[in-house]
């Protein structure tokens, strides 16, 4: 039996609310969910599942420190040049930003006519928890926090691919490999799908 990946954005049982599948199609549906979920994360340029991260970052000297993942749920500690900051010295903002009133100091020197920074150092270390509770990880005490439109996008991608396979049609299909569920479609990405991607994509 195919196991759902750690980053699977929906489950076969939840998909069955929208479309009926036979028991012998479970593995195919699970494979399509895994592939769609991975594709979504690739397009978003970020991870979605709740987990703990440890990062070393080069600050820009501004008041905002951009972490790679969000939403930030908890910051365990922040260290600058070997000294740990008190949690009162910064605040958690939207889109993976830690805000510090007196700025995040960078180490280096300006160079050239444009004063481009040189010899910069990743002198800030952050350990934090970020992400969403996915449908497959739900418990009585931890409900799903994944935005509905992201799960809906995954469901639509699986339904579209499943329908194409079931119909036997290959219009617009460039390539397909069932072994690892890779495919490309000649048709353009639906505007509604792209809108969801743009809403949650990491741009910086």
Predicted segments with their positions:
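Divalent metal-cofactor coordination and adjacent catalytic microenvironments
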Residues: 1-204
């Amino acid at each position: 039996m195919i196991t759902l990946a750690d980053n699977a954005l929906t489950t076969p049982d939840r998909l069955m609310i929208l479309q009926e599948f036979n028991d012998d199609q479970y593995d195919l549906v699970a494979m399509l969910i895994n592939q769609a979920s991975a594709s979504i994360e690739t397009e978003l340029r970020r991870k979605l599942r709740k987990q703990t991260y440890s990062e070393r970052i080069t600050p820009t000297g501004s008041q905002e420190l951009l972490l790679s993942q969000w939403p930030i749920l908890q910051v365990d500690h922040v260290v600058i040049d070997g000294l740990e900051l008190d949690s009162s010295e910064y605040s958690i903002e939207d889109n993976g930003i830690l805000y510090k009133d007196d700025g995040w100091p960078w180490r280096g020197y300006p160079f050239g006519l444009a004063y481009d920074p040189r010899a910069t150092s990743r002198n800030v270390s952050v350990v934090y928890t970020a992400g969403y509770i996915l449908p497959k990880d739900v418990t009585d005490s931890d409900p799903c926090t994944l935005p509905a439109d992201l799960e809906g996008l995954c469901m639509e991608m699986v339904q579209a691919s499943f329908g194409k396979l079931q119909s036997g049609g290959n219009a617009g299909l460039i390539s397909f490999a069932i072994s690892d569920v890779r495919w490309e479609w000649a048709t353009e990405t639906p505007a509604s799908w792209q809108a969801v991607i743009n809403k949650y994509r990491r741009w910086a």
